Regions:
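Repeated loop/turn-to-beta-strand initiation elements of outer-membrane beta-barrel proteins
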Residues: 74-77, 116-120, 186-189, 255-258, ...
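Outer-membrane pore/translocation modules
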Residues: 98-241, 318
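Transmembrane beta-strands of outer-membrane beta-barrel pores
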Residues: 40-46, 72-74, 83-89, 125-135, ...
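Residues on the lipid-exposed face of transmembrane beta-strands in outer-membrane beta-barrel proteins
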Residues: 36, 40-42, 62-70, 105-111, ...
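Outer-membrane beta-barrel "beta-signal"
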Residues: 323-342
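Residues that define the transmembrane beta-barrel architecture of outer-membrane proteins
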Residues: 56-62, 99-105, 169-173, 236-242, ...
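Surface-exposed strand-loop-strand hairpins of Gram-negative outer-membrane beta-barrel proteins
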Residues: 43-63, 91-95
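Cleavable N-terminal export/targeting peptides
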Residues: 1-27, 338-342
């Protein structure tokens, strides 16, 4: 009996020592980082017996900033989509006016060789346009318009408005080949000596304002005999040039952040000495978990965009080049899905 017990114990020990050992779990590499930020801003002004005058106003604006970035060894692929839309209603005009409208898509692919420190060969694609028509609302030349029925008031305001923009009118799309330089975490400099793209103006009425070229079939025809509604102009323009883009992203602390993008473009094919400038700034100040102040500024200069002004309409009836500037200060609800790897 003792011998059998010893044999059984030996066999059990042998079984235990030869049993497979479980290998430790190795976490798979995660290369994607995603983030989503949504914001809704609301503004309201109400005046009662206000001696200085003014309008009762209501405004609302929505903003989405989505990012999907891939990073593996020496390769990266960054994608960003920004959507911005807002409207304003003022008691002096019985219509809703658009006060914010932007579509911006950017995708950048980069690769770094072993000998390059903080330098990447890159290909950068971007697209910019807007969702809906934008108008300049001029006061209708109708006496006592406020005494008319509301439907008639709205129609008079619509008849007096002037179209300024629309979907794909204009739109800018570019592919830039060059080098990315990232000296710090908060600064990226992209220089692309080969940048090709198109300026698209779908609406015929806006083509002259964006200096679109004459269609071939109208070349050689006297100007007085050509159409004047914009149908005589092309709906796109090809551009080839060099682009310099600077991106800054700074988180000062948990409650305050700043981002900026400057884009300079020189067109080799037409007056390369004239730079097209786009400069966007955004300041975010977090007041509470879901509420924040936001200040945005947008500066644009494009020598191909002709802007009319009542101050010098007699001297420049077709408009002239001007610096465009927009500033928005807003308070609203903000919800952010923190960047995460998946």
């Amino acid at each position: 009996f003792a011998q059998d017990a010893q044999q059984a114990a030996a066999e059990a020990a042998k079984t235990i020592t030869t049993a497979p050992v479980a290998e430790p779990m190795v976490e798979k590499p995660k290369y994607w980082t995603n983030s989503l930020k949504t914001q809704i801003n609301i503004g309201q002004t109400s005046l009662t017996n206000w001696a200085a005058g003014g309008d009762n106003t209501v405004s609302m604006q929505g903003f989405v900033d989505a990012n999907a970035n891939y990073k593996k060894n020496e390769l990266f692929w960054n994608n960003r989509l920004q959507l911005d839309y807002g409207f304003l209603y003022a008691s002096s005009k019985p219509i809703f006016q658009k006060n914010a409208d932007r579509i911006y898509l950017e995708s950048k692919f980069g690769y770094k060789t072993e000998k390059m420190k903080n330098l990447y060969f890159s290909a950068n694609y971007d697209f910019k346009s807007q969702f809906a028509n934008g108008y300049e609302y001029k006061t209708p030349g109708v006496e006592n318009i406020e005494d008319l029925p509301r439907k008639e008031q709205i129609q008079h305001w619509k008849d007096a408005r002037e179209l300024k923009s629309g979907f794909l009118a204009p739109a800018y799309t570019n592919l830039a080949l060059g080098i990315d330089y990232t000296p710090t975490k908060w600064l990226t400099v992209n220089f692309a000596p080969v940048t090709g793209g198109f300026v698209i103006v779908r609406d015929e009425a806006l083509r002259q304002s964006y200096s679109m070229a004459l269609k071939k079939e109208y070349e050689g025809i006297p100007e007085a005999e050509r159409p004047t509604d914009g149908s005589q102009l092309r709906n796109y323009r090809f551009e080839l040039g060099a682009q310099l883009k600077l991106d800054v992203k700074v988180n000062v602390n948990d409650n305050f952040s700043y981002s900026s993008q400057v884009v300079l473009f020189s067109n080799y094919l037409d007056h390369p000495e004239n730079l097209r400038v786009n400069w966007d700034n955004r300041f975010d100040w977090k007041l509470a978990k879901y509420f924040s102040f936001t200040l945005t500024t947008n500066l644009i200069y494009d020598d191909k965009v002709m802007i009319k002004s009542d101050k010098d309409i007699d001297k420049f009836p077709d408009g002239r080049q001007r610096v465009q500037f927009k500033e928005t200060l807003a308070f609203g609800f903000t919800y952010t899905i923190a960047s995460k790897k998946n």
